[in-house]
Design a protein with these regions (language model features):
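Flexible, small-residue-rich N-terminal segments that precede or flank a structured functional core
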Residues: 201-257
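Residues that cap or anchor secondary-structure elements
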Residues: 1-209
Length: 258
């Protein structure tokens, strides 16, 4: 079973297996997130983060207002959240651990003149490259095997209106010794449009490419939307969801499907 429940210990918030850690408070080096598995390590910090900003664990298991059926269908401890309120002026930063993915939400609460967010990434035994699809691949330094993917970012406002994928992009700079500068850029005109409803969520996730499942949801205004690390699929009169798996486990005839 996957247990992504979080606990506080000393200056850290971490999963039980300690593979994923968050800073309880932003200190001098500004480290926010550490992912450590086997001989691979990823450390991320947000440039300009307001010092002494604290991270709070958001309880996913309480599910206030959920129906009995929703609670029954929710896998306990599969996901967990950490929120850094006002880590930048008018910006919250939220991390959601879901299954094997770490979803990062930059929550923009008010208009600004610039929507570029810079992260410093320190890698151990990994190399980073921005590929032709606009996603970032983190590969083993020796074998070249892709260990993690940072898919292309998405952005949506409080009304659920998504930005066209052409309005968001990454830039990646190798500064040496395993350190990289990652910038998440969102089009200013789209963000400042009178049609926007705040807050706006900018979503650059980190995922482990281990799943045999591919899913996609599109509508007429978001025909090229792609968010492979998003755990949800929109289905409605205007949204169409598609789901594909390349392999299925053996299911005996006597099995009950619940």
């Amino acid at each position: 079973d996957i247990d992504n429940s979080l606990t506080e210990s000393g200056s850290e918030i971490s999963t039980k297996n300690a593979k994923i850690k968050f800073a309880k408070k932003i200190t001098g080096n500004g480290t926010l997130l550490t992912i450590h598995e086997s001989n691979h390590k990823i450390t991320m910090s947000l440039d300009g983060a307001i010092k002494k900003t604290t991270g709070s664990i958001i309880d996913n298991n309480s599910m206030d207002g959920s129906t009995k059926l929703q609670k029954m269908l929710t896998l306990e401890n599969l996901s967990a959240r950490v929120l850094y309120k006002d880590i930048l002026d008018g910006v919250d930063l939220e991390y959601i651990i879901n299954s094997y993915d770490v979803k990062e939400n930059i929550i923009v609460k008010k208009k600004s003149t610039n929507y570029s967010y810079t992260f410093t990434i320190q890698l151990n035994n990994l190399n980073a490259v921005l590929d032709e699809k606009g996603q970032i691949l983190l590969s083993d330094a020796s074998s070249g095997t892709v260990e993690y993917i940072i898919p292309t970012p998405t952005a949506y406002d409080a009304d659920g209106v998504y930005a066209d994928s052409s309005l968001l992009c990454y830039s990646l700079s190798d500064t040496g010794n395993g350190k990289y500068t990652l910038r998440v850029n969102v089009d200013t005109d789209w963000m400042n449009s009178d049609d926007r409803a705040y807050p706006i969520v900018i979503d650059p996730p980190i995922s482990v490419p281990i799943s045999s499942v591919t899913d996609l949801d599109i509508n007429s205004t978001n025909a090229d939307r792609s968010s492979p690390a998003d755990p949800s699929i929109f289905v409605s009169s205007t949204w169409h969801g598609y789901w594909k798996t390349s392999s299925l486990p053996y299911i005996p005839e006597s099995a009950y499907i619940t």
